[in-house]
Amino acid sequence: MNKLSGGGGRRTRVEGGQLGGEEWTRHGSFVNKPTRGWLHPNDKVMGPGVSYLVRYMGCVEVLQSMRALDFNTRTQVTREAISLVCEAVPGAKGAMRRRKPCSRPLSSILGRSNLKFAGMPITLTVSTSSLNLMAADCKQIIANHHMQSISFASGGDPDTAEYVAYVAKDPVNQRACHILECPEGLAQDVISTIGQAFELRFKQYLRNPPKLVTPHDRMAGFDGSAWDEEEEELPDHQYYNDFPGKEPPLGGVVDMRLREGAARPTLPSTQMPSHLGATLPIGQHVTGDHEVRKQMLPPPPCPGRELFDDPSYVNIQNLDKARQAGGGAGPPNPSVNGSAPRDLFDMKPFEDALRVPPAPQSMSMAEQLQGESWFHGKLSRREAEALLQLNGDFLVRESTTTPGQYVLTGLQSGQPKHLLLVDPEGVVRTKDHRFESVSHLISYHMDNHLPIISAGSELCLQQPVDRKV
């Protein structure tokens, strides 16, 4: 087991997610790694991962997409989140530092804090698959955030040198900034290792692109429930918390576009066992080396699906090579010549980076649904819920955040439910069956008076809510 020293040279300095110092390019590319090289062998990061003993300090809700914010605002968001948890958690290293009052723009971006596991010693394992947070004593996982669910990472800022912060989505906290407190000097190693994992995962994607590039891998293994509860920009619903005993899927949310010819008639689906997910009760303090062996690994990705979705970082030099090899000649990127530093961790979706046109079936599906009275087109969650009055009322709407995704909204026992209808393979399905189309799914359940089973509860389709003409 290698020690986590940075070698004889200067440690990589990381400021606000931008790997700083002369060792890094200012072009936002991971191609030119530090002159001393990465801290760890690639096969270790691509395999079991690199583990660090740190303290989990909690998380702060992030109410806006990090991609909608400029780089400086993102950095301010993570700094403010660190300050908030330091003030709230006893014994935090940064608790005694005075901070300026939260500015009005930041107060509209940051929401509530979740300090459920604050101060807990954990083993952070960084790999190309995920950031895995496991209780250091009882070895239970408190969070497992897949790389494709992480939109920003920051560490090593002079004012918060002991902290690493990253923004990720999961079903429990929705989008939140998670804070890790590191032993002295370790934060820079942690953020560098995260950078190495992003680099390697993107290279895996370039070597093994899918036959049809669609943003469909927000989950590493399909367990039949990881995609069927909708998550949108609004943070007011945490569906997996609504059902006692329901185990949330691994971190990340499905973001899928339809694929031509993917749908099939009703067939039984293959399910995988659910894995420990975003929050579990855990234990007490433990001490040890900075690097420990990982006790529990996340399930490996499905074969042929080694790719990012949202967010993916743009490795400019590799993309240029890929375009040249493919005969493409996209327009030059203005940041390649250093005109503006690129945020290394908040990454554009791969389909944008590789300039892939949208999947053709999305349009035909939309056209087909226009003939259904219960289809309301693009509608927000709040607007859809306002149309439901009686138990059994339902409608179908197009997701406002994911093109090509359709959401079934219904009222059951006085509670609105929102179910995604398109799985990560582009198939219209429920947990138990596949369908030729959304219309087929609706008519099947209505005509046979069958409820849709999701997250341990039932949704009955009784009264379609017609759209207003």
From Swiss-Prot:
Record bears the keyword Transmembrane helix: no
GO function terms (MF aspect): ephrin receptor binding; epidermal growth factor binding; epidermal growth factor receptor binding; insulin receptor binding; insulin-like growth factor receptor binding; neurotrophin TRKA receptor binding; phosphoprotein binding; phosphotyrosine residue binding
Pfam families with a match to the protein in the record: PID (PF00640), SH2 (PF00017)
Protein modification: Phosphorylated by activated epidermal growth factor receptor. Phosphorylated in response to KIT signaling. Tyrosine phosphorylated in response to FLT3 signaling and by ligand-activated ALK. Tyrosine phosphorylated by TEK/TIE2. Tyrosine phosphorylated by ligand-activated PDGFRB. May be tyrosine phosphorylated by activated PTK2/FAK1. Dephosphorylation by PTPN2 may regulate interaction with GRB2. Phosphorylated in response to FLT4 signaling. Tyrosine phosphorylated by activated PTK2B/PYK2.
Domain SH2: 374-465
GO cellular component assignments: cytosol; endosome membrane; focal adhesion; plasma membrane; Shc-EGFR complex
Record region (CH1): 230-373
Domain of life where this protein originates: Eukaryota
Protein keywords: Acetylation, Angiogenesis, Cell junction, Cytoplasm, Growth regulation, Phosphoprotein, SH2 domain
UniProt cross-references to InterPro entries, sorted A to Z: CEP152/SHC-Transforming, PH-like_dom_sf, PID_Shc-like, PTB/PI_dom, SH2, SH2_dom_sf, SHC_SH2
CDD domains: PTB_Shc (cd01209), SH2_SHC (cd09925)
PTM sites of type Phosphoserine: S29, S339
Start and end residues of each stretch annotated as Disordered: 1-26, 322-344
Protein role: Signaling adapter that couples activated growth factor receptors to signaling pathways. Participates in a signaling cascade initiated by activated KIT and KITLG/SCF. Participates in signaling downstream of the angiopoietin receptor TEK/TIE2, and plays a role in the regulation of endothelial cell migration and sprouting angiogenesis.
Subunit structure: Interacts with CPNE3; this interaction may mediate the binding of CPNE3 with ERBB2. Interacts with the NPXY motif of tyrosine-phosphorylated IGF1R and INSR in vitro via the PID domain. Once activated, binds to GRB2. Interacts with tyrosine-phosphorylated CD3T and DDR2. Interacts with the N-terminal region of APS. Interacts with phosphorylated LRP1 and IRS4. Interacts with INPP5D/SHIP1 and INPPL1/SHIP2. Interacts with ALK, GAB2, GRB7 and KIT. Interacts with PTPN6/SHP (tyrosine phosphorylated). Identified in a complex containing FGFR4, NCAM1, CDH2, PLCG1, FRS2A, SRC, SHC1, GAP43 and CTTN.
Full protein name: SHC-transforming protein 1
Organism: Rattus norvegicus (Rat)
